[in-house]
């Protein structure tokens, strides 16, 4: 690169520093796959603004490649596990959730979730222990004098590293329905009467029986979340910090929660001042497609193209399911970009092209794209909302995807079908519905207008709050004071108990007075008769 361009880039970074405050030093504890993809967007923007960003990664990492640094500094911690072990801790979770976990009621599938998350937790605890027990690494991090730690709340350890280094920390998280992490760690209010619990697939307007199930699932999830970290993580945190503590108490110290969602996807619900919604921060302007893909898209003529993707966590689907899908796609006039890594289906039509990878963002922003078949991942849904072009057919597979699709269906922007029970005709009817009924496209365009009508873009908002924490050494004035109260006090159970005791005392006193007066007048009447 010519010297003048290097100088120009340096001046640009310096200008960002003056505009947003002093340049800071950010330490990052990320998670793999789509979590990393979203976090990296924030990190790249921080680098563009002149901040020094250091990513702390275990040597056994699947997604975090130091060779693709793009301005990031990587600090690698040696671990005893290898990349295959890390990869195997993620993919079986997706496969098990998709094929083995019972659906329809939380009371049936939460026991399976406990098993799956237990496997992930064991590996992640091992990685965390090896990082924080590395005295040489911790000493180096202390000498670096970071200003803030940015961490993914799903993968514990970032908050522990921040506590060791005595630094404020900011969380990045997708969920926004508060049954576990946000409810206990962030203090997020959760009225189960109109806020559906995560993984329920309910809309904001629940029937009476759905509200009953929602309450039961909430109680079940509360019990699970309280017991889950107590076995291994709480003793580990206490051991490392040298004092009795819990993982949840440490997580409560988060200054800001960056929730990767927004009100275009979420239902209205209470929130807190240290919770910022930044859904869609990863959306970028569409880039030109590779020549092969562009030629295929242009060959669609007036019919346009469909984009079909079930995400990266499900590498293979059964041959029977693949043939069901291919058969339906072969019957539509549109061309289809299908992200699929399995064996070529026997029923694949000439209008369908299979790719192991597709530039999903660029395809959804392409003028030929008419609709989108998605597993309901937040990234894909927000890319669709961002462009406001393709309505959706949702085929949720696991995690919060069922909720994401349910939200889009409730908002009139999608049709949902069940992956396990759908027939070729079911999928075909859903495809025809979103193409032939203009109301779906109108709803997506409406959501897109809402998404873009914000005072700050999601990425700018996320970066602002990270810089805010660096400038002010935290954001304790925004953290809820509920963190200082016991659980009985948070829900005013002590006050309710006190008031009930007062009412009971008054009632007992009134009864005593009535009995006294009754006995007195009975005695007086008796004396008069005598």
From Swiss-Prot:
Q: Where are the transmembrane segments?
A: 496-516
Q: Which residues are glycosylated?
A: 316
- Primary location: endoplasmic reticulum
Cellular location of this protein?
Answer: Endoplasmic reticulum membrane
Which chemical reaction does it catalyze? Answer: glucuronate acceptor + UDP-alpha-D-glucuronate = acceptor beta-D-glucuronoside + UDP + H(+); 17alpha-estradiol + UDP-alpha-D-glucuronate = 17alpha-estradiol 17-O-(beta-D-glucuronate) + UDP + H(+); 17beta-estradiol + UDP-alpha-D-glucuronate = 17beta-estradiol 17-O-(beta-D-glucuronate) + UDP + H(+); 2-hydroxy-17beta-estradiol + UDP-alpha-D-glucuronate = 2-hydroxy-17beta-estradiol 3-O-(beta-D-glucuronate) + UDP + H(+)
Q: Does the keyword Translocase apply?
A: no
List the keywords (alphabetical). Answer: Endoplasmic reticulum, Glycoprotein, Glycosyltransferase, Lipid metabolism, Membrane, Signal, Steroid metabolism, Transferase, Transmembrane, Transmembrane helix
Q: One Pfam match, by short name?
A: UDPGT
InterPro entries linked: UDP-glycosyltransferase, UDP_glucos_trans, UDP_glycos_trans_CS
EC identifiers of the protein: 2.4.1.17
Any one Gene Ontology molecular-function term assigned to this protein's record: glucuronosyltransferase activity
Q: Name one GO cellular component term.
A: endoplasmic reticulum membrane
Residues recorded as binding UDP-alpha-D-glucuronate, renumbered to this chain, are 374-380, 400
Q: Which residues form the signal peptide?
A: 1-17
Stated membrane topology is: Single-pass membrane protein
Instruction: Give the GO biological process terms.
Output: androgen metabolic process; estrogen metabolic process; xenobiotic metabolic process
Tell me, in a sentence or two, what this protein's role is.
Answer: UDP-glucuronosyltransferase (UGT) that catalyzes phase II biotransformation reactions in which lipophilic substrates are conjugated with glucuronic acid to increase the metabolite's water solubility, thereby facilitating excretion into either the urine or bile. Essential for the elimination and detoxification of drugs, xenobiotics and endogenous compounds. Catalyzes the glucuronidation of endogenous steroid hormones such as androgens (epitestosterone, androsterone) and estrogens (estradiol, epiestradiol, estriol, catechol estrogens).
Q: Which family does it belong to?
A: Belongs to the UDP-glycosyltransferase family.
Question: What's this protein's name?
Answer: UDP-glucuronosyltransferase 2B7
| Lineage summary | Eukaryota, Metazoa, Chordata, Craniata, Vertebrata
What gene is it encoded by? Ugt2b7
């Amino acid at each position: 690169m010519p010297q003048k361009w290097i100088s120009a880039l340096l001046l640009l970074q310096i200008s960002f520093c003056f505009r947003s405050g002093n340049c800071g030093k950010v330490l990052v504890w990320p998670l793999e796959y789509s979590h990393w993809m979203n976090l990296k967007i924030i990190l790249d923007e921080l680098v563009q603004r002149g901040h020094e960003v250091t990513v702390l990664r275990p040597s056994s990492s699947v997604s975090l490649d130091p060779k693709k640094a793009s301005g990031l500094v990587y600090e690698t911690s040696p671990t005893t596990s290898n990349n295959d072990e890390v990869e195997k801790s993620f993919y079986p979770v997706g496969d098990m959730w998709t094929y083995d976990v019972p659906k329809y009621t939380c009371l049936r599938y939460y026991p399976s979730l406990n098993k799956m998350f237990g496997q992930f937790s064991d590996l992640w605890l091992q990685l965390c222990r090896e990082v924080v027990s590395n005295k040489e690494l911790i000493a180096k991090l202390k000498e670096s004098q970071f200003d803030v730690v940015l961490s993914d709340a799903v993968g514990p350890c970032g908050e522990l590293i921040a506590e060791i280094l005595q630094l404020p920390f900011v969380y990045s998280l997708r969920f926004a329905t508060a049954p576990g992490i946000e409810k206990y760690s962030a203090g997020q209010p959760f009225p189960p009467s109109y806020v559906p619990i995560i993984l329920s697939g309910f809309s904001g307007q629940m029937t009476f029986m759905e509200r009953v199930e929602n309450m039961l699932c909430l109680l079940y999830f509360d019990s699970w979340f309280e017991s889950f970290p107590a076995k291994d993580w709480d003793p580990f945190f206490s051991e490392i910090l040298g004092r009795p503590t819990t993982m949840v108490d440490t997580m409560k110290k988060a200054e800001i929660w960056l929730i990767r969602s927004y009100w275009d996807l979420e239902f209205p619900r209470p929130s807190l001042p240290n919770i910022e919604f930044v859904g869609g921060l990863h959306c970028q302007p569409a880039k030109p497609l590779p020549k092969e893909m562009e030629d295929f898209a242009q060959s669609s003529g007036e019919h346009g193209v469909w984009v079909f993707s079930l995400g990266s966590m499900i590498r293979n689907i059964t041959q029977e399911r693949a043939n069901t899908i291919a058969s339906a796609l072969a019957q539509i006039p549109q061309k289809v970009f299908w992200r699929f890594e399995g064996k070529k289906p026997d029923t694949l039509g000439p209008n369908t092209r299979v790719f192991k990878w597709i530039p999903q963002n660029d395809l959804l922003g392409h003028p030929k794209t008419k609709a989108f078949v998605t597993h309901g991942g937040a990234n894909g849904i927000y890319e669709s909302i961002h462009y406001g072009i393709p309505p959706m057919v949702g085929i949720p597979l696991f995690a919060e995807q069922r909720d994401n699709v349910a939200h889009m269906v409730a908002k009139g922007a999608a049709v949902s079908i069940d992956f396990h029970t759908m027939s070729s005709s079911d999928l075909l009817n859903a495809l025809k519905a979103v193409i032939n009924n203009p109301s779906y496209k109108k709803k997506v365009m409406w959501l897109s207008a809402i998404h873009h009508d914000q005072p700050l873009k999601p990425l700018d908002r996320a970066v602002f709050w990270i810089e805010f924490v660096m400038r002010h050494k935290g954001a304790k004035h925004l953290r809820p004071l509920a963190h200082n109260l016991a659980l009985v006090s948070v829900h005013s159970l002590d006050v309710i108990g006190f008031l009930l005791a007062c009412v009971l005392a008054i009632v007992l006193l009134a009864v005593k007075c009535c009995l006294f007066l009754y006995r007195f007048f009975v005695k007086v009447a008796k004396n008069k008769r005598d």
